[in-house]
UniProtKB/Swiss-Prot annotation, chain B:
Origin species: Loxodonta africana
Similarity section: Belongs to the complex I subunit 2 family.
Top EC category: translocase
Described purpose of this protein according to its UniProt entry: Core subunit of the mitochondrial membrane respiratory chain NADH dehydrogenase (Complex I) which catalyzes electron transfer from NADH through the respiratory chain, using ubiquinone as an electron acceptor. Essential for the catalytic activity and assembly of complex I.
Protein name: NADH-ubiquinone oxidoreductase chain 2
Coiled coil: none
Amino acid sequence: MMYIVFIMSVLYVVGFIGFSSKPSPVYGGMSLVVSGGLGCGIIMGSGGSFLGLVVFLVYLGGMMVVFGYTIAMATEEYPETWGSNVVVLGAFLVGLLMEVFMIMWLFSGEHELVGFYFGGLEDLMVLGEEGFEYVREDYSGGASLYSYGFWFLAMAGWMLFVSIFIAIEVTRKRY
Amino acid sequence: MNPLALSLILTTLLAGTLITMMSSHWLTAWMGLEMNMLTMIPILMKTTNPRSTEAATKYFMTQAMASMMLMMALTINLMYSGQWSITKMTNPVASNMALMALMTKLGSAPFHFWVPEVTQGVELTPGMILLTWQKLAPLSLLYQMATYTNTNLIYLSGLLSILIGGWGGLNQTQLRKILAYSSISHMGWMLIILPFNPTLTLLNLTIYIMLTLSIFMILTNTFTTSMSSLTLMWNKTPAMTIMLMTTLLSLGGLPPLSGFMPKWLMIHELTKNNSIIMPLTMAIMALLNMYFYMRLIYYSSLTILPSTNNMKMTWRFTNTKHTMTLPTLITLSNMLLPLTPMISMLE
């Protein structure tokens, strides 16, 4: 199971490289969707099935849809893709090369592997450490946001509201 | 700006800093820093020219990058220690990365490049908020977590800040850039004393905020933003010209004014800890700051440049700007030195 999470993490970074090399937002949006799906897979593979589905629903199903529609309204006639411009292709290949080097370094020496332990029992006991716990952490985390973490929720809602205000204030007509 | 929107944005700016200063959990501290950053953007973009839009964009980019680094430091700390407390970041990777992120937020070298450009691109009032209020939240976090960081990094950054703040301000004629480099230099002084005696960091912050607020308010009242407008200030408000002189001397750290108090106590504390070369270098480099403040004083108060005769007899219109807190601030920023024994109040 940890192999699957590891491969998904690598592909997640490759997806990030895909839009960081700055093609047109049409292709960047596609890369974001791929990365978002893989990120959801990482969360689910590490035991948080509820929060992974929340990522799919809210991030991909809400925000990326709106992003996709706005790009479709503002797109140009010949959008720049990874193969059309040598700068974008070069940036993508450099990022890919860096990722390959990092994986080679990760498996090279005798140092401790940070964050990944191949050979654990993650398939059978999904909560990470040895002992079987009676409380699912992701469900109870989501629930405690509404009970103990009420002020976190209030602040998060307040900041979403203020962010809309700021976005409208910044994009008002400026003469 | 619409008064309702402005009040919402200023409330959230205050709330962000207060949340960071009151928190013991790293996530709420990070949340307060993000609130600060986001609500600073429309304040910086209050005027409608492309220059302030560019300044707001630069501010957003650097602060977002610093927030990202801080988040990575927090998660590394969580991975190695399993807890979110601010005062116990024992992993060196996490604490040094968080240190660098907070130094970027403060604008100390070598992460200082955004400060002069952002301060110059905006009006005087947003620049004032940028250089005074936005220092409170990152410094309150640094005050709590600095014991576990690599102190060599703090000394290096502080010394570099004093050098760059001194040398960078020498060639400037625009007052906002001069005040930005002065801010970088004062951040350097505040950082160096942090491992030795954090109370003096808070003292320096308090006195620096009072001084910077006084100077910005004097400049806002007389509509001066460059050195050439400074030369005409003697005719409009002679009293404020003299006050600008004394406040600038205080900012440079000249006794018997209150700006001398933090510098004196810091050099005292450093020499008590057997470090001689560093306070010597700091004191000498503070003279660079003093040189360009003296240049401002020379052109505003000590000389009257040649001008036509009718410019020497301008009609005095009534001042439409508020000067409500200015007399108090000027008095505090010039005459606080005899109250030095009261710093035990800050402990």
